[in-house]
Structures are given as C-alpha cells and as structure tokens.
Amino acid sequence: MKFVDEATILVVAGDGGNGCVSFRREKYIPNGGPDGGDGGDGGDIYLLADENLNTLIDYRFVKSFRAERGENGQSRDCTGKRGKDITIKVPVGTRVLDQGTGEIVGDMTRHGQRLMVAKGGFHGLGNTRFKSSVNRAPRQKTMGTEGETRELMLELLLLADVGMLGLPNAGKSTFIRAVSAAKPKVADYPFTTLIPSLGVVRMDHEQSFVVADIPGLIEGASDGAGLGIRFLKHLERCRVLLHLVDLAPIDESDPVENAKIIINELQQYSENLAQKPRWLVFNKIDLVGPEEAEVRAKAIVEALGWEGKYYMISAANRDNVNALCWDVMNFLNSQPKAMAIAESAPEKVEFMWDDYHREQLAEVEAEAESEDDDDWDEEDDDGVEFIYER
C-alpha cells in the first residue's frame, strides 16, 4: 500500500435542531399550556486512533465529512432526535492541526484514543422553556446553532525509539536490514529510500526497540532540494538519533563537510530536534581498514568539535553492530518512556458552542425572574435569537 503521511480534510459537525412552538390542545382543555419541545443537538465528529492503519491514503480521496443535523422539536414536549456522530479512523501517531488557526488540535499517540475535532450545534429551545408566571402562553423559540466547521491537516509521525540520519548512500538502509527483519531497498545510487520505514530490533526475548529509516538529506534540503525535509518530522518522537557518516564516500566527498551538512539541515528544521541526543556512527570501516578508519574518524571528530561518544561499524559485514545496538538498548532503558518530543502539550481546544447552553438558560431564568419587565420583543444583548410565532 502506498505510504501517505499528510492529508487535508474538511469536517463539518451537524447543526442543532430548532425548538418548537406548540400548545396543548385536548378535549375539555381549550387553553392548555405550552408544550413545544427542544430540538436535538447536532452530531459531533471524532478521530479514532487505530493501530491497524499505517497510512493516510484513504483521505487523499475522501476529503469531506459531515455529521447529521439534529431533528427539530415537536409538540407534546417531544425533544428532537440527536444527530449521529461520525468517527474517522487514523493511524496511531497522527498529529491533527487546524488549518485556520494553526493550532495543534491533538496528537493521536495511543490505540483507541478518541478526539473530538468538530462539535455539533446546540439545540434550539421550545416555547415550554419560556413559560413563567407573567408569560403563560409564550410564543417564542430559539433556532439551533450551526455545527463547527474545521479544515484539518493530518500529519502521520512514525512512532520509533531510534531515528537514523545521514546523506544518501551513508548506509542507513543497510544498517536497518542488518539489525531487523525490515528489508528496505539497497542500491549504489542516491535516494534508494523514498519513504520512511520501520524496523524492530530484538535484543533478546524481553527487550527490543524500533528504529526509523528516512530518506537521505542533501545540502539545501531545508529549501526543498532533493526530497526536502518533509520526512524529518518522523524523527520528532524518537528518543535518540543515530547520525551515520560514510568514511569512504563513493563520490570522494569530504566526510567532515558531509557531517556538517546534516547538522546544519537539522538545526534549520527544528531547534528541538537538533537538541535531541545524537550519536555519531562511522560506517563502512571495511572499505578502508581498521587503522585508516580510526585515523579518519578521529579527524572528523576533531573537525566537528564532537565531545560525545562515537562508534565505528560496518553495516554490510555487521562489524560492531551488535555492541552499538546493546548500547542503544541500555540508553533507552535508562530514559523515561514519555514522549520524546520536547514541546508543551497542546492547549484545550475551545469549541464554538461550549458555553452556549449555560448562557442561554441563564438568560431565560433572568427573564422569568424579572416580573416588572415582560417585554419579550426586546432585542437580546447576548446575541441569542428568539423567534416569535403567532
């Protein structure tokens, strides 16, 4: 199945049903009181995280979702039926952004997580709500409000413990093939990897971690060169990054400059991502020999001013790969399992009609208590529209 990690959808919640103006009419009861019921609330729209999905391709074709409108109120104090909700399934790891405001509506990080993204309109009130000691036969009602409309950007971010960085042909796909059952394509030309891939590294029967391989970066990626930096977002939730440096580039380029390119592109993309724990891994030591590899590695470390630990491996021959994986496993075990992305939790999203119910009923009660003022035609100051019927 084609991997799609971005999609834009339109969600429209259902409108609220209108209130009803009606009076009780039965035999021997010529002057019955008001019995107009309230309308039904509009349907809401939810997102549901599903671990069985791994792409957003479905929403490249179906881009609009509309919930059901609430039914109008009826006589005999019958409340209108509530509109049906809509639930949209998305892969675990999906981030939801409001295109209109730019706010993060939520992060779908757990299987079964449910998130409301559009709230249905509030129901209108029937004339029964407006009866009082000074208004025995109210002929006013309120209309249902409109449901929320949002244009959402869905971004799928892979959930991995370890992320891999490097130029094209640095050996990232070879490494992930060596340590896991994943089989990304490997060839001797740039950009063999076109989409992100995940591999599970099993150290023993009880311990494992997930590693993410993304397409290689090149200089100018932040300006759109190559495949750009659109795949770097998949590393935001990783707890540690492995920066692979080719000790023997096939194009005879300078490994120091190659390493600086990746560091520079990382900083231009996100300061938070640039500050993540990052390990330097020198690959392809089998092509230059152990002694020459050590000399080149030390020269690169000095040129970069690197103060952390570095590793020397051959992903193709699996030299020193197992030791690196165990160090990664021990590092992950020593870190909290909280989300690695270092940003504040999104604020609570305010929906259009959150306080509508309380405000509207408070207005009705205030009108009922005001015995010296029964002018129901007075314009409402709070914007609640009353409809009068004769």
From Swiss-Prot:
SUPFAM superfamilies in UniProt: Obg GTP-binding protein N-terminal domain, P-loop containing nucleoside triphosphate hydrolases
Assembly information from the UniProt record: Monomer.
Gene3D superfamilies, per database record: GTP1/OBG domain, P-loop containing nucleotide triphosphate hydrolases
EC assignment: 3.6.5.-
Main location per the UniProt record: cytoplasm
Gene: obg
Protein name per the record: GTPase Obg
Record: residues binding Mg(2+): S173, T193
Record InterPro entries: G_OBG, GTP-bd, GTP-bd_Obg/CgtA, GTP1-OBG_CS, GTP1_OBG_dom, GTP1_OBG_dom_sf, OBG_GTPase, P-loop_NTPase
Species of origin: Yersinia enterocolitica serotype O:8 / biotype 1B (strain NCTC 13174 / 8081)
Keywords: Cytoplasm, GTP-binding, Hydrolase, Magnesium, Metal-binding, Nucleotide-binding
Keyword presence, Metal-binding: yes
A Pfam family assignment: MMR_HSR1
